[in-house]
Every structure is written in structure tokens, then in C-alpha cells.
Curated annotation (Swiss-Prot):
GO MF, one annotated term: sialic acid binding
Residue span, Ig-like V-type domain: 19-122
Alphabetic keyword roster: Cell adhesion, Disulfide bond, Glycoprotein, Immunoglobulin domain, Lectin, Membrane, Repeat, Signal, Transmembrane, Transmembrane helix
Protein name: Sialic acid-binding Ig-like lectin 16
Cellular component terms per the entry's GO annotation: plasma membrane
Gene that this sequence comes from: SIGLEC16
Listed InterPro entries: Ig-like_dom, Ig-like_dom_sf, Ig-like_fold, Ig/MHC_CS, Ig_I-set, Ig_sub, Ig_sub2, Ig_V-set
Source species of the chain: Homo sapiens (Human)
């Protein structure tokens, strides 16, 4: 690791003075997995010396001990300055130094990018400062993170199912990875890659798909950098087939399975789940072998096989156990236009949306058998954007009338759940709005003052007329006398 003190001699002793009029705030160490993208937030301030608002401000990020005078920066907003070939098109200065921002975007991070980085600002004839003591260290780690796959515990043959794959590493201005799916249950057309921060897959399983693998692949911009997650499909058997028994139980129930065999010599008994031996007996022990599941869980679903074996042969019977449970962990995943960050929203969340923006809502839950999903807007039922994916609601262009409450319902024979989101739709306000409001306020105030003046003049006029009338009557009385 390159130590920070090695950066300090780059510009000579004159650059080591800590001038309080120059400051920069940046995270000391920035970790990023290899091949991924990260945003380095950075803010700075510098004295107003030798420049005005029309003076261009240039910012430069340099690596390690690079000389700002002769070396190439890794990123800059100065179009006349060449950047280093190794970081071209990957490092980008997204902040505006003229507005106090020096934020940096690093895409497709590589092992050789691991180093210290410092910032330099130039504006006018006097502001030329390198923030050597405020450098940050970029730590490039191995990509160990895997995508998350959301799939029902047990699939019903012949019934459509929706599977969601999410890779939870997303920043604004960072490119989205490419998703693809592979598995025996999928046709070749289902394996085409798509670019997003999550992928929604719909397919209809068959009994032959039971115990096969389904894999979600996430590929990044750099070749060879990828992540994947594999799940094993559990497709329920709808009828007794040969030596297989199908059993449905509710989550939390007590279950005791008994394996017994008559044989001579006595057989060795065993209980096997998939390919894993759960328990076994000795030939000289009891002629039965019990397996207790005191509170069955969703993960207990699968094929349990009772095996009996002695030196003369073997037999086995299988039981497919399906654990039924109502919807759990119901939530909504939201993807907004111009925002690549995927949001997980819980019940009661308020969502601020700009008018005209596109919005994609994906309702996700775990249940067995799969819950029936639907959307409502207020009291009105909203049809799904994709009939095969009732949990997906697409709003291509949000309007002001969309303001209100959107609710996803998950209905199930064992219970139902719902999650509601409150939409607040805002329109973009123009720069003249405040001026118009102020002008209207001033006109209203002037009209109000004018009305008050007219009322006062009217009152004074009435009083004068009344006084004159009174004087006239007094004069008439005097003549009569």
C-alpha cells in the first residue's frame, strides 16, 4: 500500500502549508469490489482571490505521486488536459469545482487502480492548490457478493411463477450489470441477457423440473467479472406416483415420520432428505425408525426417503413434503426513471415522484403455494402491466392524478397481506415562479392600500356633509326666533 506521507513531497514544501481558507472533505478510504462502480463524494472550498463568477474553475484528480505540473490526471473537467490512458472513460469528475463539488465516479474498478488519490483546483491567476493532506485511498477488493434470488419455496406444476434476481450494489451514474438465466426449466429464449439492476423471470414449471437448478448470472462491464446464485427448484407432485407419497402440512405443525420394514435378517433403516442422510438405525436395534419435525419450517420441504437394506436386497419409499404458509415479508421494489438505485419499500412508505417520470413497482413475497398478487389504486383495481406477472405494475408516465395510495394485495388460503405506498406527485417549478408570486403579492398589497385610502376619503366626505347640514339647521332656527 502506498502510504499517504509519500504524497506530500510532490509539490514541494510550499504546498504543505495548511491554509484554512482551503478545505476539502472526502472519505478517507473508499472500498469497491473489482469490476464494479463507486461514487466518491467530495466537497471543497477555496478563497475568492483573483477570480469572479465568470472565471472557469478546473478540477483534477491525480493518482499517487503524480506531479500536477507534468503528470496526467486520472480525471478532469479541463478539456485541454490529457487524462491517463489507464483511467480514460472509467474515471469521471462529475462534481463542479466552481460550485464546491469535487465528486468522482469510478467505473469498472481494477486491481491496479488501488492507490491514493488527491485533488487539485485551479481558478483564475491565484487559486492553484493541491489538497495533498486530504487524499483518499481506493481499496479494490475481490468480488464475493452474490445476487439475491426470490422464489417460492414450492412450485406448482403447470402454474406460472415469477422469480426475481437482485444485485444490491447500485449507484447513480453507474452502469447497470447484465442479467441472464440458465436452467433446465427454461427454454433458450429465456436466457437472453437484459441490462438493469434486477431481473424478473416468469416461467411455468413441470413435474420434470423438480430438483433441477436455476441460476441467475450477473455480468459486469469487465470481462471475467461476474457473480451468480443457484437455487434448486422444488416442484410439488400432484398425485401418487409409484412409491412417492405427497403430503401437505402447515408451517409450525408437529410432524413425525415413521419408517418400518419386515425382513430377515433385520434391515438397516435410514431417513434421507434429498441426498443427505438425516438418521439411521442398526440391524440389531428397533424395527422402526422415527423422524420428528417439532415445528416444520419452509426449509423442511422436500423429498424424504425411507430406505431399508440388508444383505439380500433393499427397498425404499419416498414422501414429498410441502410446507404450506401464508405470505411473509411482503414488500415492493421500486425502480424510478433516471435513478438506477433499486429501493425496497415497506408498508406505509411515502414516495415522492416527479410528474412525467416513469415508475416500475414489483410486489414480492414468500408463500406456499404462491399467493395471488393484485394492485389497487385507492378503491380501484389496477390491471397488471404484464398478465403473466400480476405483481408488476408499470407507470410509463406519472401524472398529477396518480397521487394517492397504491396497494399490493397478496391473497392466500392461509391468510393475506397487503403493503401500501403513498404517492406524492410534484411538478418541476420554473425559475420565474418566485418572481411571479412576489409581483402578484405586491400588486395585491397596492390594491388593498388604495381601497383603504378611498374608504377613508369617503368617510371624511360624509362627515363634512353632515356637519354642513347641521350648521344650516341651526341658522334656520336662529332666523325663526
Amino acid at each position: 500500500m502506498l502510504l499517504l506521507p509519500l504524497l506530500l513531497p510532490v509539490l514541494g514544501a510550499g504546498s504543505l502549508n495548511k491554509d484554512p481558507s482551503y478545505s476539502l472533505q472526502v472519505q478517507r478510504q473508499v472500498p469497491v469490489p473489482e469490476g464494479l462502480c463507486v461514487i466518491v463524494s467530495c466537497n471543497l472550498s477555496y478563497p475568492r482571490d483573483g477570480w469572479d463568477e465568470s472565471t472557469a474553475a478546473y478540477g483534477y484528480w491525480f493518482k499517487g505521486r503524480t506531479s500536477p505540473k507534468t503528470g496526467a490526471p486520472v480525471a478532469t473537467n479541463n478539456q485541454s488536459r490529457e487524462v491517463a490512458m489507464s483511467t480514460r472513460d472509467r474515471f469521471q469528475l462529475t462534481g463542479d469545482p466552481g460550485k464546491g463539488s469535487c465528486s468522482l465516479v469510478i467505473r469498472d474498478a481494477q486491481r491496479e487502480d488501488e492507490a491514493w488519490y488527491f485533488f487539485r483546483v485551479e481558478r483564475g491567476s491565484r487559486v492553484r492548490h493541491s489538497f495533498l493532506s486530504n487524499a483518499f485511498f481506493l481499496k479494490v477488493t475481490a468480488l464475493t457478493q452474490k445476487p439475491d434470488v426470490y422464489i417460492p419455496e414450492t412450485l406448482e406444476p403447470g402454474q406460472p411463477v415469477t422469480v426475481i434476481c437482485v444485485f444490491n450494489w447500485a449507484f447513480k451514474k453507474c452502469p447497470a450489470p447484465s442479467f441472464s438465466w440458465t436452467g433446465a426449466a427454461l427454454s433458450p429464449r429465456r436466457t437472453r441477457p437484459s441490462t438493469s439492476h434486477f431481473s424478473v423471470l416468469s416461467f411455468t414449471p413441470s413435474p420434470q423440473d423438480h430438483d433441477t437448478d436455476l441460476t441467475c448470472h450477473v455480468d459486469f462491464s469487465r470481462k471475467g467479472v461476474s457473480a451468480q446464485r443457484t437455487v434448486r427448484l422444488r416442484v410439488a407432485s400432484l398425485e401418487l406416483q409409484g412409491n412417492v407419497i405427497y403430503l401437505e402440512v402447515q408451517k409450525g405443525q408437529f410432524l413425525r415420520l415413521l419408517c418400518a420394514a419386515d425382513s430377515q435378517p433385520p434391515a438397516t433403516l435410514s431417513w434421507v432428505l434429498q441426498d443427505r442422510v438425516l438418521s439411521s438405525s442398526h440391524p440389531w436395534g428397533p424395527r422402526t425408525l422415527g423422524l420428528e419435525l417439532p415445528g416444520v419450517k419452509a426449509g423442511d420441504s422436500g423429498r424424504y426417503t425411507c430406505r431399508a437394506e440388508n444383505r439380500l436386497g433393499s427397498q425404499q419409499r419416498a414422501l414429498d413434503l410441502s410446507v404450506q404458509y401464508p405470505p411473509e415479508n411482503l414488500r415492493v421494489m421500486v425502480s424510478q426513471a433516471n435513478r438506477t438505485v433499486l429501493e425496497n419499500l415497506r408498508n406505509g412508505t411515502s414516495l415522492r415522484v416527479l410528474e412525467g417520470q416513469s415508475l416500475r413497482l414489483v410486489c414480492v413475497t414468500h408463500s406456499s403455494p404462491p399467493a395471488r398478487l393484485s394492485w389497487t389504486w385507492g378503491e380501484q383495481t389496477v390491471g397488471p402491466s404484464q398478465p403473466s406477472d400480476p405483481g408488476v405494475l408499470q407507470l410509463p408516465r406519472v401524472q398529477m392524478e396518480h397521487e394517492g395510495e397504491f396497494t399490493c394485495h397478496a391473497r392466500h388460503p392461509l391468510g393475506s397481506q397487503r403493503v401500501s405506498l403513498s404517492f406524492s406527485v410534484h411538478c418541476k417549478s420554473g425559475p420565474m415562479t418566485g418572481v411571479v408570486l412576489v409581483a402578484v403579492g405586491e400588486v395585491a398589497m397596492k390594491i388593498l392600500l388604495l381601497c383603504l385610502c378611498l374608504i377613508l376619503l369617503r368617510v371624511r366626505s360624509c362627515r363634512r356633509k353632515a356637519a354642513r347640514a347641521a350648521l344650516g339647521m341651526e341658522a334656520a332656527d336662529a332666523v325663526t326666533d
